[in-house]
């Protein structure tokens, strides 16, 4: 303890005035069952308002000819709904006596005008809609690649992001690849793979179909299948429908 302070001079508390907002429940009649039902309805409207809320029970508006109120029962109902009774306001002798018996403070009747306090219903916020997914990036479109010389066996020619046009013959063992369509304006004896990145609308156009293999978006036919087609060796186009390659005459 500081030598400059003694138990008689060192203050351990202060009394201060304060304006606190206290909810007042003004009872109009002695009907605890109706009060319980109506409080439950109020709690359903705004449950956060009724959460350990300090309360003054105003009994000074009860008719004088009504019987004594069950004050402990009234406080239990209030406590059940989240209202904590701090004191009562009363003018009837029986109500004041009931409060004194349970050591509950009694305030004098109020002459001030009080406005009804209605808890605002809680607004339930609707969840924000999920943002729309961004559109898939547009495939990079490049100019058509044009090959004017014969394509020999073992060569591989790829048209990235576009179509491939070959104006000469394609030998066995040669391979043509394109992200788009393939056009061969000569004998097609090698392999032609169009739409290799999944473009199911790609097509293959051949002046003379004698290919080792044709493929669109991963669906293919090899030479053994193509030879059985009546259009073998003629001018055809190859398209994809579902997972079936269709060969039709040009």
Curated annotation (Swiss-Prot):
Keywords: Cell cycle, Cell division, Septation. Residues 110-143 are annotated as: Disordered. SUPFAM superfamilies: Cell-division inhibitor MinC, C-terminal domain. Residues 129-138 have a biased composition (Pro residues). Cell division inhibitor that blocks the formation of polar Z ring septums. Rapidly oscillates between the poles of the cell to destabilize FtsZ filaments that have formed before they mature into polar Z rings. Prevents FtsZ polymerization. The keyword rRNA processing does not apply. It comes from Pseudomonas putida (strain ATCC 47054 / DSM 6125 / CFBP 8728 / NCIMB 11950 / KT2440). Coiled coil: none annotated. The gene is minC. Residues 112-128 have a biased composition (Basic and acidic residues). The keyword Cell cycle applies. Interacts with MinD and FtsZ. This is Probable septum site-determining protein MinC. One of its GO terms (biological process) is division septum assembly. Belongs to the MinC family. HAMAP family: MinC.
């Amino acid at each position: 303890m500081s030598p400059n302070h003694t138990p008689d001079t060192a203050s351990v508390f202060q009394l201060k005035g304060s304006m606190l907002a206290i909810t007042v429940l003004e009872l109009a009649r002695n009907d605890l069952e109706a009060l319980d039902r109506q409080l439950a309805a109020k709690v359903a409207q705004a449950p956060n308002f009724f959460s350990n809320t300090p309360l003054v029970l105003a009994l000074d508006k009860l008719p004088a000819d009504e019987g004594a109120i069950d004050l402990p029962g009234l406080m239990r109902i209030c406590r059940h709904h989240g209202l904590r009774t701090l004191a009562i306001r009363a003018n009837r002798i029986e109500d004041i006596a009931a409060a004194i018996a349970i050591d509950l403070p009694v305030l004098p009747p109020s002459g001030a005008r009080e406005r009804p306090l209605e808890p605002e219903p809680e607004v339930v916020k609707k969840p924000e809609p999920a943002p729309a997914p961004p559109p898939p990036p547009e495939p990079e479109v490049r100019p058509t690649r044009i090959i004017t010389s014969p394509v020999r066996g073992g060569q591989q020619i790829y048209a990235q992001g576009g179509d491939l046009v070959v104006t000469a013959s394609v030998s066995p063992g040669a391979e043509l690849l394109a992200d788009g369509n393939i056009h061969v304006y000569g004998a097609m004896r090698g392999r032609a793979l169009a739409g290799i990145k999944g473009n199911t609308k790609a097509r293959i156009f051949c002046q003379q179909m004698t290919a080792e293999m044709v493929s669109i978006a991963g669906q293919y036919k090899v030479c053994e299948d193509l030879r059985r087609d009546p259009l073998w060796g003629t001018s055809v186009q190859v398209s994809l429908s579902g997972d079936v390659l269709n060969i039709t005459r040009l």
